[in-house]
C-alpha cells in the first residue's frame, strides 16, 4: 500500500509532528569495549576549561589539583569554570530574600531525614564502585563488603543501622594508618578432565588479606569508577559516567536531600517533580510571563543549552553554597553536609579497563590495564590516543587520574539546579533595575529562559546580562545551540511547548512491546503501557486499538502461542492444538495458552485472568491458579508489581501493573556460566544476604514490620519475636504444648551458639 507521507500530516498541526523527528525507534546504540578513552577525554576537557586556575598538591595522596575558583574573568565566549565565590554567595542571598525562610526550613526537614535514615538506603542503586575489590558490584554487595571490612578494622558505629553512624565510621577510617581488606583472586591451573581426557583450565577462587596504607586507602575512598553511558540516542560519540564508592554515596545523599527540599519550594525548578506535575509547574511560569507582558511589552523565550555543564561546575562552589545555606545551623549538620563537596574536590577518576591491543598477523590479543598507561611506551598508540595519554600523565596515580574541578555526570543534579535557579531569580525587575526582566525554568543542566522587554534591543540586553551573570558562577550558555522564539513556543527537557505542552509520543515508543519477564507479567505490562499512554500522552483511541493489536501479535510471536486453530507451525503448536481441542469454553483460554484476545481499549485495566475467569472451564481454572503446581516457583502474590520500563531518555521508570499469579508467572533460572568465574564468591555472598533478608521478613511480616531499634542484632530480634509469637499461639491454642517447647528449645540453642561464637 503506497502512502504519500505528506498526506499523513495534512490535518496535523506542525508542532504535533515533532515526535516523528525523534531518533527513538529501533535499538539504541550500546558501547562495547573499554571506556578508558572517554574518561580520559572527560578529565582532559575538564582541566582545559579551568586551565588558568592555580595548581596545588594534595598533601595526603600527592595528587596534583587544579583550582579555578575566583580565577580570571572570561574575555571570550569559550566555556570556562572560573566561578567567583562572592557572586555565588550573593546569588544565594538574593534567592533567600525572594523566598524568606527557604533555607532554614529545608535544613530542618533535612535534619529530620538524617536522624531517621538507615544505612540500607545505600543498597538502592545499581552498580557501585567496590573499593575492597577495586571494581563495580551491585550496591548491596558493595555495602556489605565495606561494612565487613570496617568491622574487621575495629570500626563499629554502623552496628546501630543509622546511615549517619556509618558515615562516622567512614570519617574515622580516613584517619587510620592502615586498613586490612579481603580481596578475591583467581588461580588458573591446567588439569586433565576424567571424562573427556582433554586438558582443561580450572579456576579456583581464593580470598586473601591485603593491607592498604593510609595513602592507598584514601585514593580508593575518593575514587569514582567510570563506565560508558549506554543506550544514548541521537549522539554520535559515547561519553563516560561515574559510579562513586560507598564512602562518598552517603554524604552525597544527604546533600541532595537538602537540595531537593529547596528545589521543591522553587517555582522555577523542574526537579524533583516529573510527568504531568512538572508540566503544570512549567505552564505556570509561562502563564505568569505572558500575563505580565502588557500590550507594550515583547516576550521571547530561549530554548537553552549549556556547554559541558558538569565539567564547568566546581565542588568548591558547592561547598560555598552549602556553607551559606546552613549558616545558622548546628555544627554537626554543617560538617556532615560539607564532606561531600570536599571529597569531590579531591576526587580521583578511575580510568576503567584500559586498552585492548591485537595483532592480526600473530593472532595475539593483550590488555593494557589503566595502571600501565603512566609508564608504557607511546609508540603503540595512534595519534589521538597518544595525545590524550600525554596530557593526562601528570595526573595519574595508580591507574586513577586526579580530577579536582568538574562534577562527573549526575552527581549533584539537585544542588546544581539550585544554582541555576538562583540566576533565574535575579531577573526580577527589582534586581535588574531597568526595563527588561527575565524568568525561566531549570532542571539540572537544561533551561528555558523567558525575557520580557519593551523593545528588541531590550530583549537583547536582557539575554546578554543573563549570559554574563551565568559566566560568573561557572555556567556557560551555548550561543550556538540555544535559540530564541516568541514566547509560546519552546522546548524544555524534551517537553515541547506550543501554547500548552504537546505530547511527544515518540519518547514512549521504546516502552511498547513485550518485556520478556514471563507470560503473565508481559501481558499485564503491555496493556498497562497502552493505558498509561492514553491517559498521559494523547494516544488516541484508534491508535491505541492498533497498538493493542500489534502488541498481541508481538506477544504471540514471542511466546509462540498462536491461536489454537491457526496454521502457523511452531514448537508449541502441537501442545496448544491439543489444549484447544479439549477445551469446552475456548473463550476462556489465555492468549499465552493459544486463546483469543479479549482486550479492547475499554478494559485495559483488568488483568487477563480476571477478564476471562467466568469463561474458563473449571479444570482449566484449577490448573491455571494452582499454588501447588511443582513447575512454578511462585513469588508471594502481590496485588501490584513494579516493572521497569525504558522511556526514550532519562532513567528507567518504574511502572506499576496488576499482577495475578498463575502458572504463567514463572521465574527464569540464573545463567550458570557465572558459577565458573571470579564472581562466584560474590554470588554466594549475595545469595546468603538474600536468604538472611528473606528469613528476617518472614519473622516481621510487612504489616508489623518495625525496624529493630537499639542495638539488637537481626538474630536477637528474630529470636525474641519467635518467642513472643510462640507464646501467643500456645495460649490461644493454635499450637500444642510439645511444639511450644520445641520452639523454645531451638531459641535457646541459637542464643547458646551465638555466645560460643
From Swiss-Prot:
Positions occupied by motif Nuclear localization signal: 187-195, 203-216
GO terms for cellular component: host cell cytoplasm; host cell nucleus
A GO BP annotation: viral RNA genome replication
Keywords for this protein: Eukaryotic host gene expression shutoff by virus, Eukaryotic host transcription shutoff by virus, Host cytoplasm, Host gene expression shutoff by virus, Host nucleus, Host-virus interaction, Inhibition of host RNA polymerase II by virus, Nucleotide-binding, Nucleotidyltransferase, Phosphoprotein, RNA-directed RNA polymerase, Transferase, Viral RNA replication, Viral transcription
Enzyme class: transferase
Keyword Metal-binding (UniProt): no
Subcellular location per the Swiss-Prot or TrEMBL entry: Host nucleus; Host cytoplasm
Stretches the record annotates as Promoter-binding site: 249-256
Coiled coil location: none
Region (Disordered): 52-82
Comp. bias intervals (Polar residues): 55-64
Chain ranges of the RdRp catalytic domain: 286-483
Catalysed conversion reaction: RNA(n) + a ribonucleoside 5'-triphosphate = RNA(n+1) + diphosphate
Post-translational modification comment from the UniProt entry: Phosphorylated by host PRKCA.
Role, per record: RNA-dependent RNA polymerase which is responsible for replication and transcription of virus RNA segments. The transcription of viral mRNAs occurs by a unique mechanism called cap-snatching. 5' methylated caps of cellular mRNAs are cleaved after 10-13 nucleotides by PA. In turn, these short capped RNAs are used as primers by PB1 for transcription of viral mRNAs. During virus replication, PB1 initiates RNA synthesis and copy vRNA into complementary RNA (cRNA) which in turn serves as a template for the production of more vRNAs.
Subunit annotation: Influenza RNA polymerase is composed of three subunits: PB1, PB2 and PA. Interacts (via N-terminus) with PA (via C-terminus). Interacts (via C-terminus) with PB2 (via N-terminus); this interaction is essential for transcription initiation.
Protein name listed in UniProt: RNA-directed RNA polymerase catalytic subunit
